[in-house]
Each structure stands twice: as structure tokens, then as C-alpha cells.
Amino acid sequence: MALVGYGVMVGIPVISTAWVTLLGFTEVQVGRVAGADLGGLSAGAVLASLLVARVNRRYLVVAAVVITIGANALSMVTVTYEQVLWLRFTAGFGSGIYTAIAVATLAGTSKPARAFNILLFAFAFSQALELHVLPQLSMNGIYLAFIGSYVVGLIFLPWLPPRPIDKGLDVVVDVADDDTEHHSEHLHVPAYVPWLVLAAVFATYVNIGAYWTYIELASNPPPEMAEWAARVSATPEWVARVLVWASFLSIVGCLFATVLSNRFGLARPLLVTLVCQAIIVVMLANGINNVNIVISMFSFNFLWIFADVYQSATIANVDHSGRFASLLPGAQGLGQIVGPNIAASILAAGLGYGGVFIMCASASLVGMLIYLFMYLRLRKTIPALADAS
């Protein structure tokens, strides 16, 4: 179900290109529409976070599916920019509720870090499948594919627990006694911890949202962007292939993320990840060629999984009710509405794709600073949680 919910987020590069080539939208309009879709995801997730511990989750999922299918069906008969903008927000809203429930349920499992790692491992294959199949479909075919995926997702509804078992915000730590014996203690986790993680997720996804929305368009700029076009030597066919193959780096990322977290915990690898992500994005600011696009996109997918695994596992370690975990898609969706819209404004101001990539790198560094602040605070108060795996 989580894979279905994240379907639009994964397919944004292909969908963005389809909106330009099949519906005639401008690059600026694409940023607004993509932002509306992913902003709806955020709004839906926020609503779900308020209801996830109170209302039967199965009812919420059914309502979300009805909203999402209806909006996608109406998108098939609507082609004007203003109408598509609102329909994509509505589709994203339903998707946000659906995805938030799925993520909250994963966070409530006995081994949430492993559950999220399995999700992201499967995510790599679904991402590759989408990026391979969607470009071969018409605009209506893309919408039909999303409708079909939500219908299939209903098959898993009976396995969805209606309510959470544990509603506490705490963590179990191993404490050494004076006689070298060990015992476990339940420590209450300050509410600022999950909120800071969500803030870091938001900043991270400002980068991801803008990069993922515009990377294919930046590699094949229109004639009116002559100055940027002069810096681009990558071929569109090559970029399309790289998009598909880069998704498999997520698999490698899952494996490395597990190994590193077992040895160094969650926080320290994440801090390094966000710095590296800033570097591999800003390297495109001076132009795109067949070499640096491969390095950037492969590294981006590899590090994207690192960030998701560590951030999701950090929240899951302290929140078993699903309240904060269900806000993960909200923070991601909010970042993905803000990122493309900032990028669209940068393009509208004539600053070009170089400005977009600099903004992306800055957002990643902001996320790193937020997470660093949280890590340093936890080192003083709950060291075991600061370095938890």
C-alpha cells in the first residue's frame, strides 16, 4: 500500500515531461501542478495524523481510495491548467491519507526499522518499473495506471490493523548497573525530537522535490532557454535510460544503509548523507553532460534511500501510535510542493536551472543542520537514542 501511495512521487520526472509534451504546459506550470499534487499528499497526511489513532484505519483507506480514483478519472477528461491544478491537489490529498495510514502501520510493527528497509528495497523495483512503463503511456494511460494500482491496493485492506496497539512516545534503553548487570528502562522522549526529524525531512524533500521534478527537463531545455541549453550536452535518450537504471541504486542504498546503521547508528550516517547529497546536486549548476548526469542521478538515488531509511527509522523508534509516523508523507509532500514551486519561481525570475540546483543543495544542508542540532541535544539527554540503530 505504501508503494502505491508513493507512486506519483516516484513518477514525477516522467509525469512532468508528459504534462509538457502531451498537455502543452510550460516548465513553470509543471512546477505548480507537481507542487499541487504533492502538496495535496501533505495535506492528506496531516489530516490522517489527526485521525489515525482515533478512527478505524480501514474506513480512512476506503475514503482515500474513492477520492484518489475520482480525481484521477476526472483528470482524464480535463486538460486546462487551472482545472488540472485543482484535480491533482485532490488526487494528492486522497493519496496522502492512504500513504500516511500505510506508513503509520509500518511504524507500529515490532521491528519498524526493518519494515521500512524492506519497503524501500521494494521501492527501488517499483521506481524502476514506473520510470520504464509510464513514458510509453498516453496521459490518460498514466492516470489509468494510478487508478488500477489503488484498486489492487484494496486487496490488502483485511490485513490492515484498525487501530494502534501502543500510543506512547517513549524509548526502551539498555542501562548498565554498577555491578556490570544490565536492565531496560522506559524513557519518555521529548516531543521536539520527532518534530525536528519532520522538519529535517521537509528540508530534505525541498531538495528532492525540485531536483526530481526538473532533472529531466533541465537535461532537455526548450529553445527559449538558450543560455542554459548551451551548457547542456546530455542527450534526452541517454537521460531517460539513466533515470531507469539509477533507480536500482536504491537497492544498493538499502543494503549499505543497514550495514552502516548497525555500526554507526542512524544519526551520523544521515548527517554525512545530507552533505553528500548537496554536493552531487550542486555539481550540475554549471551545466549537464552525459558524465555528470550519471554521477549525479546514480548518487542521488543511492543517497535518497539513505535519508529515507534513517529518518523513518528514527521516528519509528520513538512513536508507536502512528501519529508522527503518519506525518512523514506530510513532511515529504510539503517539501515536494515547496521545492518545485521555489524552482518554478527561480525559473520565472530568469535565474535558470543553475539557480535551481544551488537552491536544492542549500535545502539539503538546512536539513543537515536541523538534524545536527537534534543529535547534539540527544547526546546530552538520551545518548542511547542519539546513536540508536
Regions flagged by a language model, labelled:
Residues 96-110, 305-319:
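Intracellular juxtamembrane helix-capping segments at the cytosolic ends
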Residues 264-311:
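C-terminal transmembrane helical hairpin of 12-TM major facilitator-type secondary transporters
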Residues 83, 117-166:
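Helix-loop-helix hairpin linking two adjacent transmembrane segments in secondary transporters
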Residues 318-353, 360:
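A late C-terminal transmembrane helix in Major Facilitator Superfamily
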Residues 44-57, 253-266, 347-348:
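Helix-to-loop junctions at the C-terminal end of transmembrane segments
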Residues 43-79:
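Conserved MFS/SLC helix-loop-helix module at the cytosolic interface between two early adjacent transmembrane helices
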Residues 12-13, 191-244:
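Extracytoplasmic gate region of multi-pass secondary transporters
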Residues 24, 56, 77-82, 265, ...:
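Helix-breaking motifs and short loop linkers at transmembrane-helix boundaries and internal kinks
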